[in-house]
Amino acid sequence: MKRPCEETTSESDLDETIDVGSENNYPGHATSSVMRSNSPTTTSQIMARKKRRGIIEKRRRDRINNSLSELRRLVPTAFEKQGSAKLEKAEILQMTVDHLKMLQATGGKGYFDAHALATDFMSIGFRECLTEVARYLSSVEGLDPSDPLRVRLVSHLSTCASQREAAVMTSSMAHHHHPLHPHHWAAAFHHLPTALLQPNGLHTSESTPCRLSTSSEVPSAHGSALLTATFAHADSALRMPSGGTVAPCVPPLSTSLLSLSATVHAAAAAATAAAHSFPLSFAGAFPMLPSNAAAAAAVAAATAISPPLSVSAASSPQQTSTGTNNKPYQPWGTEVGAF
C-alpha cells in the first residue's frame, strides 16, 4: 500500500514540476513577456507615425488649396467666374493652362502689366464720359451740334484725352528705350517756351488770344505734327502773355532732344488713331507744332542761345484775319457753371 502512495506523490510532484517547468520554459513566453513590457512604446510610436503622416498630408493639401486660390485670383477668366459659382480644381487648372497659352501666343504681353491695364481702363472710361457729355448736351440741354459752347467743350475734353494717351505712350517708349532714366525726355517739354504751343509756331499777335479751336479753323498744313504737352493745366499752358516777348527759358536740352522728335511723331500717330476711333472730329482741337517751329527749337537748344526769344508782333495776313474772327479766351468755369 505504501508503494502506490509513493508513486502518486512522485507523479504529483512530477506534474507540479512539469507544470512549473512548462510555465517557465515555454518557448513563446519570453517573446510574449517582452511584447507585454514594450507594448506601450510600440503603440506610441505607431500613433506618432500616424499623426506625423496626417500633419504632412494636411500641409500638402493646404499648399495645394492655397495655390489654387492664387490661380483663381490671378487668372482673369477664373476671377470673373469667382462670384457666380464655386469653381472646381480641374476648371481652375484648365483656365490657367489656357491663360498661359494665350500669354505664349501674344509674346508674354498679357495681364501682368498692371499699369498698362489700369491706363487702358482709364482711357476707356474717359472716352465714355466724353461720349456721355456730348449726349447730354445734345439730348438734355438741347444744344445743336454746331453750338459754340458744345463744340469748345467737346474739343477741350477730347484734347485732354488725347494728351493723356499720348503722354502714356511716350512714357512707355522712353521707359523701354532708356531704362536707367525713363523720364529724362520730360525736361524737353518743361523748358519749351509757350510760343511753341501756338498753332502758327513762333509768330503771334497781341490782339489774337489763344483759345481752343475747332477743326474748321485750323489749316490742314499744321496737322502733320502734334506736340503732346505734359503740363498739369492745359489751359494755362495754352495761354500767351499779353506782351510780345517770351522769357529766356530755353536751357540746353542735351540728350532730351534725341527723344523729342520721336515723342512728337508718336503723339501724332496716337491722335490720328483716336480721331479714327471716335465719331467726332478732333483734328483742330490739338495744339500743333509745325515742322519749322520744331527745327527752330532744336537749333536754338543745340546752340544754347543766351538771349531771350522774341516773338514778332506782326503776323501773316491769313493769321491776322483768323485772329480777328476768334473769340477771346473765356474760363471754362463760367460757361459750365451755367448748367
From Swiss-Prot:
The keyword Repressor applies. Residues 47-116 are annotated as: Transcriptional repression and interaction with NCOR1 and SIN3A. Residues 22-46, 318-328 have a biased composition (Polar residues). One of its GO terms (cellular component) is transcription regulator complex. Keywords: Developmental protein, DNA-binding, Notch signaling pathway, Nucleus, Repressor, Transcription, Transcription regulation. Highly expressed in the aorta, lower expression detected in the heart, brain, kidney, lung, muscle, ovary and testis. PROSITE patterns: BHLH (PS50888), ORANGE (PS51054). Residues 1-52, 310-339 are annotated as: Disordered. Residues 48-103 form the bHLH domain. It holds the Pfam family Hairy_orange. A motif (YQPW motif) lies at residues 329-332. Disruption phenotype: Mice display a spectrum of cardiac malformations including ventricular septal defects, tetralogy of Fallot and tricuspid atresia. The penetrance of the cardiac malformation phenotype varies according to the strain, suggesting the presence of modifier genes. Residues 8-18 have a biased composition (Acidic residues). One of its GO terms (biological process) is atrial septum morphogenesis. Residues 122-157 form the Orange domain. Gene3D superfamilies: 6.10.250.980, Helix-loop-helix DNA-binding domain (4.10.280.10). May self-associate. Interacts with ARNT. Interacts with GATA4, GATA6, HES1 and HEYL. Interacts with HDAC1, NCOR1 and SIN3A. Transcriptional repressor which functions as a downstream effector of Notch signaling in cardiovascular development. Specifically required for the Notch-induced endocardial epithelial to mesenchymal transition, which is itself criticial for cardiac valve and septum development. May be required in conjunction with HEY1 to specify arterial cell fate or identity. Promotes maintenance of neuronal precursor cells and glial versus neuronal fate specification. Binds preferentially to the canonical E box sequence 5'-CACGTG-3'. Belongs to the HEY family. This is Hairy/enhancer-of-split related with YRPW motif protein 2. It comes from Mus musculus (Mouse). The gene is Hey2.
